[in-house]
């Protein structure tokens, strides 16, 4: 297939471009050109959130794509750009949202695709407003243009730092700290659940979803095969590094009020994948231990 990726130089978008190319697809990446993109892909340089610039960049390629995959759609305006520009160049769009769209005070375990959403102006709220633009468009249009949205939680793998929870979320010196025997400070002792997904699994599901009609104009929760506490994640990381782990509890009371940016973390993040299962798309299968081992090996290789 001919695939258009909005993004291509980031953690997820770059890996998506690599995997798509390895599968034999021809890939174009839209970036601002400030960072390198994977080898073997075509570069389209513009601000993807500027509709005129995006339209001109896509027109310059003089082709139709089998699908577009937007890894950088972050709010209602960017969703509106997708809907105003992309249908002239493709009939299919995959979008990455976030599990942070849910209001943490009302989440269930496991949480499905319906729920109470944030409207506080933060990251999760902006992503939900993005979703609402697509939902509204689908409800008021008979266009053949079809989208699918996925809500991953913690995405992990080579290309990103380890750590999934405050105060050690994607911390560049986390491995060094652990090797020095420093205690880890986790809010609430890390009692909340997470449902991490290995980056390669997320990319595979995105690509496999392209022709699946039962996924058209639908939103899906997505996560890997393991649901663990945040504390268990760090203990597993210690096992992989062969170092002991001591966890110091940061009181939960008052932390969210002082650090509202972590609202999507200070709750259980465990999801039902039943809706995704019913499409027939193979569910993510990489165990947390296996994916985290690969991530650690990649990070250690950078330090050599």
Where are these regions (language model features)?
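Mid/C-terminal beta-alpha module of Rossmann-like enzyme folds, strongest
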Residues: 208-267
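Amphipathic terminal alpha-helices
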Residues: 286-304
């Amino acid at each position: 297939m001919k695939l258009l990726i909005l993004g291509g130089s980031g953690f997820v978008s770059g890996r998506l471009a690599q995997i798509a190319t390895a599968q034999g697809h021809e890939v174009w990446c839209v970036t601002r050109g400030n960072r390198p993109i994977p080898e073997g892909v075509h570069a389209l340089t513009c601000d993807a959130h500027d509709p005129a610039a995006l339209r001109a960049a896509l027109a310059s390629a003089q082709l139709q794509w089998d699908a577009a995959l937007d890894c950088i759609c972050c709010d209602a305006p960017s969703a509106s750009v997708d809907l105003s520009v992309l249908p002239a160049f493709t009939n299919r769009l995959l979008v990455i949202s976030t599990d942070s769209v849910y209001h943490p005070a009302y989440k269930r375990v496991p949480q499905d695709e319906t729920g109470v959403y944030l409207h506080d102006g933060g990251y999760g709220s902006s992503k939900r407003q993005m979703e609402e633009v697509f939902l509204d468009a689908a409800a008021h249009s008979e266009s053949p243009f079809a989208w699918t949205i996925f809500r991953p939680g913690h995405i992990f793998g080579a290309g990103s730092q380890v750590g999934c929870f405050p105060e050690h979320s994607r911390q560049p010196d986390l491995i060094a700290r652990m090797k020095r025997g420093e205690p880890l400070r986790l809010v609430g002792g890390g009692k909340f659940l997470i449902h991490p997904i290995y980056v390669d699994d997320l990319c595979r599901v995105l690509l496999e979803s392209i022709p699946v009609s039962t996924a058209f104009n639908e939103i899906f929760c997505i996560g890997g095969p393991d649901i663990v506490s945040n504390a268990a994640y760090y203990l597993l990381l210690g096992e992989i590094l062969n170092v002991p782990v001591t966890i110091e509890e940061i009181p939960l009371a008052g932390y969210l009020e002082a650090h509202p940016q972590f609202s999507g973390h200070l709750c259980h993040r465990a999801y039902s994948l039943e809706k995704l299962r019913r499409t027939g798309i193979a569910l993510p299968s990489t165990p947390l231990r296996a994916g985290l081992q690969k991530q650690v090996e990649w990070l250690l290789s950078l330090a050599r």
